Amino acid sequence: MRAYCPHYQFMLFWIASLCWFSLIVLWGTGFYSLLFYIISVLLIIILYTLYFIGENMFSKGKIKESDSTTTIISKNTSFVGDISSGEKIIIHGKINGNINTNNGVVFIDKGGVVNGRVLCEKMILNGELYGECCCSTLDVYENGFLQGEVSYRFLEIRNGGCITGIVNKVTDEVQNNVSELVKARES
């Protein structure tokens, strides 16, 4: 399956626009020898665009496999159990259980509630967490509320954010030891 990136589509639009503008200028000034090259470049861009975008345009009924590895718990969803992922987890609903993302990001949005332990590289809290949180970076937003025990290296609490319980700043040496223990525990 061919890869497609929306940034290329935007870039191709500007290249095609530049070629079209150059084509009009050359036609108006009478430089017909360059006109041939500009038309050729414009056709190449159009064919290139159809090659990559046309696949999406004419493939009715085919569901394209997503490259995204983000786990999303939607607003009206309740989940009981543990979640383990290597990437990003976005929580809009409710989770009763533990969340483990070794090098990932956990984002608990406004209205999202987690009862359990969260282990992650970065935690963005705009909802509620009741339990334990161990992360490298913790950002508590305006609506964020954490009740329990927190271990972090970097902490930011915005106006309105709240942490109640035990708060521990972890040094690099302790963080490395914790990482080794987590890896040993998973083995």
From Swiss-Prot:
Q: Which UniProt keywords apply?
A: Membrane, Plasmid, Transmembrane, Transmembrane helix
State the species of origin: Escherichia coli (strain K12)
Transmembrane residue ranges: 10-30, 34-54
Q: Which InterPro entries match?
A: BacA/B (IPR007607)
Topologically, how does it sit relative to the membrane?
Answer: Multi-pass membrane protein
Q: Which GO terms describe its cellular component?
A: membrane
Q: Where in the cell is it found?
A: Membrane
- This protein's record includes keyword Membrane: yes
Q: Which family does it belong to?
A: Belongs to the bactofilin family.
* Protein name in UniProt: Uncharacterized membrane protein YuaD
Answer whether the UniProt record assigns the keyword Transmembrane to this protein. Answer: yes
